[in-house]
């Protein structure tokens, strides 16, 4: 990321919501909490709320994280490694470790909230759970119908994909707009409405609503 920023200083880097969630899940698995995540609805919902912090205004992320962390440790205090999970998310995505000295001062997180925050996109009605590249990769998987295609199948698949992309490009320059799949359009609208309620309800209620919509 640093090398990219140095090469393209005016570019704005925005992380993907899908990969933010995957990062949290990988840590859950690493800490041996996979079974609990799969079987305990309350724990699973709280874990998903961590990624839902991406829909909180950047300036409010740290405070919202503290509220969520307090709720998690209070509601499920007996879960082993829960503090490690929260510390991982805090130091990786919210803020670094507390600095010595008076007052509450923290070092920078590995990934500043600016880099993974999704709120502006949701407010503008372009909320996504995956990015464009992720969608293209999924399209290729559907096209090949296998994980390891033969060379000829791979070439024919690329030719077919090129034809589809060329047709889509021609439709775009002639003003023809392909409609979104209805269920995804409805989901984006629901996320946009939910984001609009921020500040009108308790932050935990807000995070749970976003977390639910992200996995329906």
Predicted regions and their residues:
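C-terminal non-catalytic accessory extensions
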Residues: 206-209
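Extended amphipathic alpha-helical interaction segments
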Residues: 1-186, 193-196, 215-216
């Amino acid at each position: 990321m640093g090398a990219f920023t140095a090469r393209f200083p005016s570019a704005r880097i925005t992380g993907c919501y899908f990969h933010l969630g995957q990062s949290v899940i990988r840590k859950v698995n690493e800490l041996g909490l996979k079974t609990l995540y799969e079987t305990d609805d309350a724990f699973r919902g709280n874990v998903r709320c961590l990624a839902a912090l991406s829909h909180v205004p950047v300036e409010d992320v740290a405070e919202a994280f503290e509220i969520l962390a307090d709720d998690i440790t209070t509601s499920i205090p007996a879960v082993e490694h829960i503090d490690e999970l929260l510390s991982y998310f805090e130091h990786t995505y919210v803020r670094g470790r507390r600095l010595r000295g008076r007052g509450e001062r923290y070092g920078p997180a590995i990934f500043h909230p600016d880099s993974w925050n999704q709120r502006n996109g949701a407010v503008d009605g372009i909320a996504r759970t995956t990015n464009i590249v992720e969608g293209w990769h999924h399209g290729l998987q559907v096209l090949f119908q296998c994980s390891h295609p033969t060379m000829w199948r791979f070439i024919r698949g690329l030719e077919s994909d090129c034809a589809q992309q060329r047709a889509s490009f021609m439709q775009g320059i002639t003003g023809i707009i392909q409609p979104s799949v209805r269920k995804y359009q409805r989901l984006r609208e629901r996320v946009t409405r939910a984001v609009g309620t921020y500040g009108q309800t308790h932050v935990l209620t807000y995070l749970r609503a976003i977390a639910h919509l992200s996995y329906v």
